[in-house]
Amino acid sequence: MSLSVPDIGPAVVTLGVFDGMHVGHRQAIEVTAVAARARDAASVAIIFDPPPIEIIRPGTLVQRLLPRDLVASRVADAGADHVLEARFDAALREMAPEEFLAALAPGIELRGVAMTPDSAFGRDRAGTLERVAEIGAIAGFDAIAIEPLLVEGEPVSSTRVRAALAAGDVATARRLLASPPLLRGTVIHGDRRGRELGFPTANLAFAYTPALPALGIYLGAVAVPERNVGPAHPALVSVGVRPTFHDEGRVLVEVYLLDWDGDLYDSELTVEFTVRLREERRFESVEALVDQMRADEAEARKRLGSGPGSSMATARLLW
């Protein structure tokens, strides 16, 4: 199996993709940790990567809410004693649920498996909560139900977070995530058009397929640890196809850091989205576009609480 299991001992396990580590995922980790303590055991979260749907339906690329390494760190921060990553491949897909659970030994002595009633794993998704209870009755561990978490009357899911982002509803996405939606990319060379217009932007390329918000202009926060930028440097973020100049259908993410003058090429930026200022639109002239960009910056500074040096923390308090 494409999973390395260290010597953990007695444990309660939960498993999934955990994309975004939204509030429902956090509840799952908390339930697992409580169940583990009650059984004098460790809590273990097993992360499947890539998302199973990418293997089950070749050619599918999941729009991810977090880079892979941040998923693992946030699962740990939520309270899991151990975080294991299982590479989901064709072999793992064909494992029956009882085979997968048995393969956790000898490193893990199962005391429980925590799952939501609608989740499943293993070949043909046979590993339902009911099936795990049957396996546990024979093998000597418990099936632990994690009740779905409802926000505004609806279950929280990564799909729901993506839908909020696709609608440009950053506030709802943030409520579901309990943190600002973000993406991470590397600064690449663009056509320098922003610099020519007086708004030098950092153009981002991604090593994964990020879940992008709706096309538009956003107020955001940027961190560039290697350049001592941030961790909450205010910025305007454009997600769009630049229709004033051309519309080739390729969505670009461009970041304009307020009160920043420096070279960020090849740097890795983490960009948090705070609020959508406006939708993307085509302007009749470059001059009209520049006027709007100035208005966008003025609006951003107003929300931040004035001029140069304004703290991004102010925006976080307001939103």
Language-model-detected regions and their locations in the chain:
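N-terminal catalytic cores of NTP/NDP-binding nucleotidyl/phosphoryl-transfer enzymes
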Residues: S4-P67
